[in-house]
Amino acid sequence: MNGSLGVILAGGLATRMGGGDKGVLPLGTSTLLSHVIDRLTPQVDSIALNVNGDGSRFAHLGFPVIADSIDGFAGPLAGVLAGLDWAAEQGVNSIVTAAADTPFFPSDLAARLHREAGGMAHPLVIAATPDPKRGTSRHPTFGLW
């Protein structure tokens, strides 16, 4: 662990799949969200879930549930802002974010992001992968903020 708080971004509307919580979709014997939690937990000091709507539907997971501070489902950056506000309340100045619907991110994502930040006082590093057509594909839901 590296002194970061993890925020799982699960506040989307899932409009392309007709609505609902993508994180609760099954993957094997579990859910997408459970896989993300299992992957992120060893990489951070603690985790919160950024969700919209009735947060009590995630209470059984035992994590703090934080809602966007901006109304109207403003997108994942609103979740990042809510996560940063939550971290500030904990006395921490950075968060590592992961998307609730993308379970197969690196098991050393947080370490990679911190390494790329290189000791920045106010880090901002997002995940990226090589793309033969575009050069680089950025994945801003996975980042160090």
Where in this protein do the model-derived segments appear?
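Nucleotide and nucleotide-moiety/phosphate-recognizing core
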Residues: M1-W145
